[in-house]
Amino acid sequence: MMTDPIADFLTRIRNANMVRHDSLEVPASKIKRNIAEILKNEGFVRDVEYIDDDKQGIIRVFLKYGKDNERVISGLKRISKPGLRSYVKADAVPKVLNGLGIAIISTSEGVITDKEARAKKLGGEVLAYVW
């Protein structure tokens, strides 16, 4: 049994990115779909598609690379873990690399970026940093 599916998802992205794979597939869940959509909207991945397989589904993530095949994602870090949850108040939402990266935060209004959380004045659980 997997104890932290979000960490597994981020690790699969990190590993595929390191060996410059074009895409990767992960078992789907609602929170993974939300995280993948955030990565797409923020320009870290090229595309995300959901494949219905009459079970839990599969998320296919298409990785993005710059010219000369340079990585767009230079780092991914899981912050709030099952053994040590990390919560922030609305006035303490972190900035990643002075705004060059993003923090993915699970709030009462869903999974959003640190910029959206600051704009909506929401706190929540800091899931991961991406830069």
Swiss-Prot record:
GO cellular component terms, semicolon-separated: ribonucleoprotein complex; ribosome
Keyword Metal-binding: no
Keyword match Cell membrane: no
Biological process annotations from GO: translation
GO MF, one example: structural constituent of ribosome
The family this protein is said to belong to: Belongs to the universal ribosomal protein uS8 family.
Role played: One of the primary rRNA binding proteins, it binds directly to 16S rRNA central domain where it helps coordinate assembly of the platform of the 30S subunit.
NCBIfam families in the cross-refs: PRK00136.1 (NF001109)
The protein's name in its UniProt record: Small ribosomal subunit protein uS8
Source organism per UniProt: Lactiplantibacillus plantarum (strain ATCC BAA-793 / NCIMB 8826 / WCFS1) (Lactobacillus plantarum)
